Regions:
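Carbohydrate-binding surface patches
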Residues: 483-486, 491, 530-586, 590, ...
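Alpha-helix-loop-beta-strand connector modules within alpha/beta enzyme cores
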Residues: 292-299, 389-409
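Glycan-recognition surfaces
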Residues: 317-362, 396-503, 519-530
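Bacterial Sec-dependent N-terminal signal peptides
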Residues: 1-25
């Protein structure tokens, strides 16, 4: 009879399954290769997730079989109702796990085998689910939730595989030639009666275990100051086709537009390379004949104050070229492997490379970096030795050096375990696949992925919902509101001549500062375990805003014409969702006021739901504001996140004192002696205001 693993695994024996270190290594990475059913030493013991011990949520292998690089385990799951498997999509001939890029997607299922069906109703703008994934959320039959996630050890990485029969396998491997050794971390899992706490509890445990992560909670990190302001990025406007003249002309056009863009992000298209491998940290001399000097001279304290630059974690898309112009002391910290130069092999050499890399950008005058292609760094090392340790060291060295040099960092294509679990200082990571102008299905998928992934990513970083076009006639204003409630960076990619001010100005104050929520938006409970592109139902998200409000956006993301019109709602109980974000939801309020941002109307919510009709690809934004001592504070009505535009300094039964952060129309609800009114107060100058009943 097999012994069942509970929380600490004391594993004794296994069944050999066609793998040894002397055999050809199966982990050399190339485009189109998958790791489904990879050869592994099959352990007899079952990882049983039916039993939960909150004090020790990390499962570990204590006795690793000798001379094995890869182990596999059967995973026993509790009875469940439905779930989410987090993996990338699997496109034949394309890159596969662990190169998740920005494609970590939430795949909904009633039974795990649903994910293996060729007719799986997934996400219309993406391929079918990859069987190899990194995390799993289950709604259990007893009403609780279980979250399980793969983790990395000092030189090991685990992952899940969904099998054709609906069973689940856990693999753990060095992804290379060396053997697994020591106490081996396998996975982390937690159970909770709250779908929100199951994520936060898991990350509390993960952060506390330094052997498997280098993390801090999002709230404990410093947010880079440029990201508090409106930005502009070259990518969706130009893609690779950038040069010095175009950027200088666009800076002129931005300044002439009257829109207070405060930073410019220069995306891909500037890198000196050969066959997509980096040859120099000096930009392409044909496109940028003066280097960065002329562009840097355009920075001004009250206009475009910050300039950021795109780069790849591994040098360029396919690594670093042997034909490079680096100084000798830098060349010696690079080693040749599988057709590319890579930083390493020691931790010290990797740190030296990233010190040179980041310092060079700092000396050019850049204020922050967008570091892309992060999840492809691991595949570049795969099949060698010390694969996990070296790839992880790249992420950590980037964190160390940007922090040391006080440079901002935007992480992109950073959705595998090594990337996600090692954002020690950085506070921003892309949450989704690229946004594309005029593509309705991609926009719907983008919103669904961004909000759902924030349940994971949002524990340690602010989610970057990508750039957007204010001139997008399909969803420009809708996208603007989603950027506002995301809490992450907000940056345009229109041609400056096409800026739509009506979609942009509600995001910001007169200086370009963004009105941000107190925590990033995430799905409401009924929306977490459904696919809103296929469900026939509305999709809702929420975020705490201002001192005491909760903002809710209701969407119709359905792709079928049969669900062109759906019904949504807001209700009193929604306000209590503030507590799930770690913010107070004081129940001492008299009532909850619902402010409909589009209609600029308000009503007191009663015991029943407030129904909303959503026709086509649309959204509806509400602010739920508590009525206390006869007052409800909505904020400046012209701004998407109205409650974030004011600070409540004092409130009595007859007086309200506020600090108003921008000009516009201040909306206040007053209830005195049975008389209720929604007041409009013109604000000509930001600052302190006293209001009496």
């Amino acid at each position: 009879m097999k012994r069942i693993i509970h929380i600490c695994l004391w594993l004794l024996t296994g069944i050999f399954a066609e793998v040894s270190l002397s055999a050809q290594n199966p982990f050399i990475y190339h485009k189109g290769k998958t790791y489904k059913d990879v050869a592994a030493y099959r352990m007899e013991e079952i990882i049983d997730l039916n039993t939960h011990t909150p004090s020790t949520p990390i499962l570990c292998e204590q006795q690793v079989p000798e001379h094995q690089s890869t182990l596999s385990y059967k995973v026993a799951l509790p009875l469940y109702v439905r779930g989410i498997f987090f993996s990338r999509d699997s496109r034949p001939g394309d890159y596969q796990w662990p190169n998740n890029t920005n494609r970590l997607l939430p795949w909904m299922f009633n039974r795990l085998e649903d994910l293996t069906r060729s007719d799986y109703a997934g996400i219309p703008s993406n391929a079918l689910p990859s069987a190899s994934g990194d995390a799993l959320l289950l709604e259990l039959a007893d009403g609780e939730y279980l979250f399980a996630k793969a983790i990395a050890g000092s030189n090991s990485l685990s992952w899940f595989q969904v099998n054709q029969d609906g069973t689940l396998t856990l693999y753990v491997s060095t992804l290379g030639e060396d053997a697994l050794t020591g106490r081996l971390p396998l996975l982390i899992f937690r159970k909770s009666s709250s779908v929100y706490h199951v994520f936060s509890d898991a990350y509390d445990s993960l952060i506390a275990k330094k052997a498997v992560s280098a993390l801090r909670k999002r709230a404990d990190k410093e947010y880079f100051n440029a990201f508090d302001y409106l930005g502009w990025c070259t990518w969706e406007h130009y893609h690779y086709d950038i040069d010095e003249t175009k950027i200088l002309n666009d800076i002129d056009a931005i300044e002439a537009s009257g829109i207070p863009v405060r930073y410019v992000l220069i995306d891909d298209g500037h890198i000196a390379n050969k066959n997509r491998q980096l040859t120099s940290l000096v930009p392409d001399k044909k496109r940028f004949p003066n280097g960065w000097s002329r562009i840097m001279k355009r920075k001004q304290a009250d206009k475009i104050r910050w300039i950021g630059l795109w780069y790849s974690l591994s040098g360029y898309w396919m690594g670093i070229s042997a034909e490079n112009d680096f100084p000798p002391e830098i060349r010696q910290v690079l080693h040749s492997y599988n057709g590319s130069l890579l930083p390493g092999t020691s931790t010290e050499k990797i740190e030296t490379w990233y010190e040179y890399y980041v310092r060079t950008m700092k000396e050019y005058g850049f204020d922050f970096l967008k570091i892309d292609n992060q999840s492809f760094t691991l595949p570049l090392y795969m099949g060698g030795t010390q694969v996990i340790r070296q790839a992880k060291d790249c992420n950590l060295a980037l964190e160390h050096q940007t922090h040391r040099m006080q440079m901002g960092l935007m992480n992109c294509m950073a959705q595998n375990v090594l990337n996600i679990d090692h954002t020690l200082y950085s506070s921003v990571t892309r949450a989704s696949i690229d946004y594309k102008k005029y593509d309705e299905n991609m926009a719907k998928s983008h919103l669904f992925q961004s909000y759902t992934n924030t349940l994971i990513l949002g524990q340690t970083v602010w989610p970057d919902h990508d750039m957007f076009h204010s001139c997008d006639t399909v969803c420009g204003s809708l996208m603007a509101r989603s950027k506002a409630i995301s809490g992450g960076p907000v940056y345009l990619s229109d041609s400056p001549s096409e800026f739509i001010a009506d979609n942009i100005r509600p995001l910001i104050d007169e200086t370009g500062k963004i009105f941000r929520p107190a925590a990033p938006a995430i799905p409401t409970p009924e929306s977490i375990l459904t696919n809103p592109l296929q469900s026939g139902k509305a999709y809702r998200v929420f975020a705490p805003t201002g001192d005491e409000a909760l903002s809710v956006i209701c969407y119709n993301l359905n792709t079928s014409p049969a669900y062109r019109e759906v019904e949504s709602f807001v209700k009193q109980e929604d306000y209590l969702l503030r507590e799930s974000t770690g913010k107070s939801a004081d129940s001492s309020s008299d009532n909850i006021l619902a402010f409909n941002w589009e209609k600029q109307s308000a009503e007191v919510l009663n015991a029943s739901e407030r129904k909303i009709k959503l026709s086509g690809f649309t959204d509806s934004l509400f602010h739920l504001c508590p009525i206390r001592k006869g007052w409800a504070v909505i904020g400046i009505q012209e701004k998407y996140l109205s409650p974030a535009t004011v600070q409540i300094l004092k409130r009595t039964t007859d007086k309200l004192i506020l600090d108003v952060h921008c000009t516009g129309t201040l909306r206040i609800w007053a209830d005195s002696h049975g008389k209720q009114e929604l007041r409009s107060i013109p604000i000509k100058k930001a600052g302190r205001i006293e209001i009496k009943k």
